[in-house]
Regions:
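Conserved C-terminal helix/tail region of periplasmic/extracytoplasmic solute-binding proteins
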Residues: 33, 37-38, 69, 164, ...
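A structural signal for short loop-to-beta-strand junctions that line the ligand-binding cleft
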Residues: 85-86, 93-94, 122-163, 313, ...
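Hinge/lid segment of periplasmic solute-binding proteins
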Residues: 33, 100-155, 196, 211-216, ...
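Extracytoplasmic/periplasmic substrate-binding proteins
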Residues: 44, 57, 103-105, 207, ...
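Extracytoplasmic "Venus flytrap"/periplasmic binding protein-like
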Residues: 56-130, 164-175, 271-272, 279-280, ...
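Long, aromatic- and glycine/proline-rich binding clefts that accommodate carbohydrate-like moieties
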Residues: 38, 136-137, 304-311, 358-413
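Helix-loop-helix "hinge/cap" segment bordering the ligand-binding cleft or interdomain interface
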Residues: 59, 120, 138-213, 222-263, ...
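Extracytoplasmic ligand-binding clamshell segments of periplasmic binding protein
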Residues: 77-81, 89, 194-197, 203-205, ...
Length: 449
C-alpha cells in the first residue's frame, strides 16, 4: 500500500475544518469518566511523514475530547508479526491499522473486538461500497472485525497524447476485453515520443508483492473466482479463471508489452509510466496525487500533461471488476479503553476527516459519501470512484495470505513463460498446468484450516 504526501500547508488548511467537526460531537470527559485517557494507535507507513500527518489530523480530536493518542509507527515489513504477537499475548495497543486482506487472519486470532454492536453509530454497512464492507468480515465467524479507514483500487492509466497519435479513441478503447486488446495493438504504431521509445503496455511480474491484485480482475471479469463459494477449495483452475488469466498473459507475446516491466515491482513500473516508457498500465490512485507535484521528478513533461484514467474493460460476463483494498482499523480485546477507542474510530470515520486524510496519502476515503465527493473532482477521479463501486476483494478467510502467495508464484511463472523465459513454450496447456499446480497448493493450505 502506497501513500503520497501533500505539502504541510495543505494539511494545515484541513485542521481548522477538522476542529469544527470534532467539536460538534465531543464531550469534555471520556465515556469511562476518567479525566485523562491515552490511547495507543499503531499505524503503518502512510506517506513520508506518517506520524506527523496523523498527529495533525488527530489534533482537533485530542483537543476537544481530552483523549490523547500516542501514534506509533510500525513498518509494513514487521507489522504482520507484531500485530499477531500483540493479539495473542494481550500486550497490545488499543487500535491498529491493518491491511484489508489481513483482517480475516487477525480476526481469527481471537484477540480483537467484535464491533458489530457499534458500527451503526457510523452508518453501518450501508455507508460503504459492498466490496469495501466485505473486508470487515471473517468467513464462519459472524461479526464486524474492523472498520474501513481508507481505500485504494486498481484501474487503467493511459497517455492521452499517445492514444490520439495512434488514432485510438479512449471512449471506446476500454469498453470490452476485445476493444482493449485492439487498442493496445494499434498503439504499436507509435514507437517513440520526443525521441524516446514507448511501448503500449506494461505491468509488473513475479517480483511484485501485489501481482494477484493485477490479474484477479480479469479472472472475475470472466466469471471466475479465487475460491469456491464455500471457501473450501481453490477455483483458480476453473475454465473461467483460465480464460481470465490467459487473456492477460496473451498480451505479453502480442508485441504490446514492455517485457522489462515483468522483472520489476509495481512502484518501478509506475516510474516507467511517469518516465514515458509505457502508454498504458494498471495502477492505484496515489499516482494522481503526484501529477501536479513539481517535486516528483519521475514525471516527464509529456506524460504529466497527458494522464488519463479509465475503468477496467468489461469481460465476457458483461461486467467489469477491480481489486479494492486499503486499510481498516481494529480494536484489541485487551484494550482498557474500548469506548474511547471507538470514539477515535468514529472521528476518523467522519466524512470530512476521511476525505482530508485520504488526500494527504493519495488514496480514496473508505465511505461512500466522501468517495462520491472525491469522484466529482475531475474525470480522472471519477474513474477511480467508478472502479471502487465495482470493486471486489478476496474471500474473507484466515489463510488467504498463504493462498495468495501460491497464486502469485504461479501467475509469475505464467508471465515468464509468456515472455519466453520459461522452461516450456507458451500455450494454453502451459497456463492450465500452472493454474492446476496453484490450485493443488491452495487446496493443501485450505485443508489445514
Amino acid at each position: 500500500m502506497r501513500a503520497k504526501r501533500i505539502r504541510f500547508a495543505a494539511v494545515m488548511s484541513f485542521v481548522l475544518v477538522l476542529a469544527a467537526i470534532a467539536g460538534s460531537t465531543a464531550q469534555a470527559r471520556t465515556e469511562s469518566g476518567a479525566a485523562q485517557v491515552t490511547l495507543t494507535m499503531w499505524i503503518m507507513n502512510n506517506g513520508p511523514e506518517p506520524v506527523a500527518d496523523m498527529k495533525r489530523i488527530l489534533a482537533p480530536f485530542e483537543r476537544s475530547t481530552g483523549i490523547n493518542v500516542n501514534v506509533q509507527l510500525v513498518g509494513w515489513d514487521v507489522q504482520y508479526q507484531r500485530i499477531t504477537n500483540a493479539a495473542i499475548s494481550g500486550e497490545a495497543p488499543d487500535v491498529t491499522q491493518a491491511g484489508t486482506t489481513q483482517v480475516p487472519y487477525f480476526a481469527a486470532l481471537n484477540g480483537f473486538e467484535n464491533l458489530a454492536s457499534r458500527v451503526n453509530r457510523i452508518g453501518g454497512r450501508k455507508a460503504y461500497a459492498g466490496g469495501i464492507w466485505a473486508t470487515t468480515q471473517l468467513a464462519g465467524k459472524p461479526g464486524v472485525w474492523s472498520v474501513p479507514w481508507f481505500t485504494e483500487a486498481r484501474t487503467i492509466y493511459y497517455r492521452k497524447d499517445v492514444y490520439k497519435r495512434a488514432g485510438v479513441n479512449p471512449q471506446t478503447a476500454f469498453k470490452t476485453w476485445a476493444s482493449f486488446r485492439a487498442a493496445l495493438l494499434k498503439l504499436r504504431s507509435v514507437r517513440n515520443v520526443n525521441g524516446k521509445p514507448i511501448m503500449p503496455f506494461g505491468q509488473p511480474g513475479k517480483t511484485a508483492w501485489d501481482l494477484v491484485h493485477h490479474i484477479m480482475p480479469f479472472v472475475w471479469g470472466a466469471g471466475g473466482a479465487e475460491l469456491t463459494k464455500n471457501h473450501r477449495s481453490s477455483a483458480i483452475a476453473s475454465p473461467q479463471a483460465i480464460r481470465g488469466v490467459k487473456y492477460f498473459s496473451d498480451l505479453v507475446p502480442a508485441g504490446v508489452f514492455l517485457k522489462s516491466s515483468l522483472e520489476k515491482n509495481a512502484p518501478q513500473v509506475e516510474e516507467q509510466f511517469k518516465g514515458g516508457q509505457i502508454a498504458t498500465w494498471i495502477g492505484g490512485p496515489w499516482v494522481l496525487a503526484t501529477v501536479n507535484r513539481a517535486d516528483d521528478e519521475a514525471w516527464v513533461p509529456e506524460a504529466r500533461r497527458n494522464v488519463g484514467v479509465a475503468q477496467m474493460p468489461v469481460g465476457p460476463t458483461g461486467k467489469f471488476y477491480t481489486f479494492v483494498g486499503g486499510s481498516n482499523l481494529m480494536v484489541f480485546k485487551s484494550s482498557s479503553h474500548k469506548n474511547e477507542a471507538f470514539r477515535l474510530i468514529q472521528y476518523l470515520s467522519q466524512n470530512t476527516v476521511q476525505r482530508n486524510y485520504a488526500r494527504i496519502m493519495g488514496m480514496f476515503p473508505a465511505r461512500l459519501v466522501p468517495q462520491r465527493q472525491e469522484g466529482n473532482r475531475n474525470a480522472n477521479s471519477k474513474a477511480f470512484y467508478q472502479a471502487i463501486k465495482h470493486g471486489r476483494t478476496y474471500a474473507p478467510i484466515a489463510s488467504w495470505g498463504p493462498v495468495e502467495n501460491a497464486y502469485k508464484t504461479r501467475f509469475g511463472n505464467i508471465l515468464d513463460i509468456a515472455a519466453g523465459q520459461g522452461r516450456v513454450s507458451y500455450s494454453r496447456s502451459a497456463v492450465v498446468n500452472e493454474l492446476r499446480a496453484a490450485a493443488r497448493e491452495a487446496n493443501t493450505l485450505l485443508s489445514q484450516r
